[in-house]
Amino acid sequence: MIKSLFYTFLQTKHQEESNNSRDPNYPLFPQEIEIRPIAYFPWEIIKTLTTDEIISKFQLPMEKIRDTMLRHASEEDIYRTKFMSCETNILVKDLDTNTIHQGKLWKHPCENNFALRESWIEEFVKRRRLVVGMVVGMYWDFEACMFCFSVLDGRQ
């Protein structure tokens, strides 16, 4: 979210009643507001959190990783990742709190998905108090080369 400072001429009822309404020099009242940029629906990964994702790891589908992070990799490299154990450090931006966190993206050779593990639990589940049933979304920011994360539906 973007924080902006706006100045307004509007006063509270108390300020309006206590000031002289004939005075042409009304003071400006600064007010800080948060603006979430209006954009197309960018969420490439939308998940309703399960118990496994709260206590263990956040699964990211191989197709989404291939289409985003590995889009410049050759078909041979992508084929090799299916049968190898892979681990890489990535950045994840929490759009709700405007913070950036480092995470480890990991893939086991027997699984077809990538996963965020320990860093997911510490940086997101505990810090944001995520619970089973919340809907979260992620997308890959191509300009910043990082995932962007947000809680889309916080109802429990």
Curated annotation (Swiss-Prot):
GO MF, any single term: DNA binding
Gene3D superfamilies hit by this protein: DNA-binding pseudobarrel domain
InterPro entries: B3_DNA-bd (IPR003340), B3_domain (IPR051442), DNA-bd_pseudobarrel_sf (IPR015300)
Compartments (UniProt record): Nucleus
Keywords: DNA-binding, Nucleus, Transcription, Transcription regulation
Keyword Transmembrane helix (UniProt): no
Ranges annotated as DNA-binding: 57-155
GO cellular component annotations of the record: nucleus
Protein name: B3 domain-containing protein At5g26805
